[in-house]
Amino acid sequence: MVYEGNENYRMELTSLRARMDPCWYYYNGVSTFSSMAYEKVSNMQYHLGMFGNYINSYTYHRQTPVYNAFFALDYIVDNDQGSTAQMNEHYYERLFSKGKFTAYKNNYTLPVAFRANEEIKYWSHDNSNPFEVQSGLFE
């Protein structure tokens, strides 16, 4: 398959080997581990449902369509052979499979940059329920 689109896209694997897979494999992902990462961003990602240490890392695992849209994840590559989870065909279009990898196109993503109304500054992510945090982000 040859990709014929904008080279500025974000993707993630469903099962990472390390928290730095985007860096190791040179792709634009959301997972990160860095001593330079802002703790507040790590806190926010944790409250949004990402796995992390709440200090300087957060790791992508299968997420909700809301999270994937908000963080502009254009492609999800399912490489978790042990999982029975299915990608919902309403949200994701199966592109191709090769070996243990199956690539999906996210049908609903927001652009990498977009404008929100002024009320976003009152949004709080201090909640232990990631579904409520994600819902509050879109209200």
Where on the chain are the PLM-derived regions?
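Generic secondary-structure transition motif, activating predominantly at the C-termini of alpha-helices
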Residues: V2-N6, Q45-G52, Y108
